[in-house]
Regions:
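Two-component system phosphorelay core
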Residues: 1-99
């Protein structure tokens, strides 16, 4: 067994993952508000944090989206950001456990 497998399968780590996903889902409303208020700096910060943290939880796709959100926020491209936020929401929701 790979040490990474052991780490990612740890019940305590799985609990942290679920808490992080819940945090991201709760952040989605604020992210959308920042988009429609064209607060590109807050979106850039969100993307930067997502890029840095999501990968540590094994969410490479979310991490890559965070990097794109960070970069595109700097260019203030509203339409592209809107698409990236939609991609983020879809990617996040497919990772949420069924209720």
């Amino acid at each position: 067994m790979d040490i990474d497998d052991e780490y990612f399968n740890d019940p305590e780590f799985q609990l942290l993952i679920q808490k992080y996903l819940k945090y991201l889902l709760e952040s989605l409303r604020e992210v959308k508000a920042n988009l429609y208020n064209r607060d590109f700096e807050k979106l850039r910060q969100f993307g930067h944090n997502l890029k840095g943290v999501a990968g540590g939880y094994g969410f490479d796709e979310l991490s890559k989206l965070g990097g794109k959100i960070e970069t595109v926020s700097s260019s203030e491209n509203f339409d592209f950001l809107k698409n990236l936020i939609s991609d983020f929401e879809a990617s996040l929701k497919k990772r949420m456990p069924p209720v």
